[in-house]
């Protein structure tokens, strides 16, 4: 996938945060 240096970095961070929150939700349930 293409990554814009400025927005790409923030997108990656948010993606990782979403992944972590999803994992947390799965483990919580």
From Swiss-Prot:
Temperature dependence: Thermostable. Activity remains unaffected even after incubation at 100 degrees Celsius for 30 minutes.
Activity at various pH: Activity is stable between pH 2 and 9 but decreases at a more basic pH.
Secretion signal, residue range per the UniProt entry: none
Localisation: Secreted
Phylogenetic classification of the source organism: Bacteria, Bacillati, Bacillota, Bacilli, Lactobacillales
Superkingdom in the source lineage: Bacteria
Function: Has antibacterial activity against strains of L.monocytogenes, L.lactis, B.subtilis, S.typhi, S.aureus, C.perfringens, E.aerogenes and M.luteus but not against E.coli, S.sonnei, S.pneumoniae, S.faecalis, P.aeruginosa, K.pneumoniae or P.vulgaris.
GO cellular component: extracellular region
GO biological process: defense response to bacterium; killing of cells of another organism
Key words of the record: Antibiotic, Antimicrobial, Bacteriocin, Secreted
Keyword Secreted among record annotations: yes
Protein name: Bacteriocin
């Amino acid at each position: 996938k293409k990554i814009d240096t400025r927005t790409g970095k923030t997108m990656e961070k948010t993606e990782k945060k979403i992944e972590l929150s999803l994992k947390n939700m799965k483990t919580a349930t």
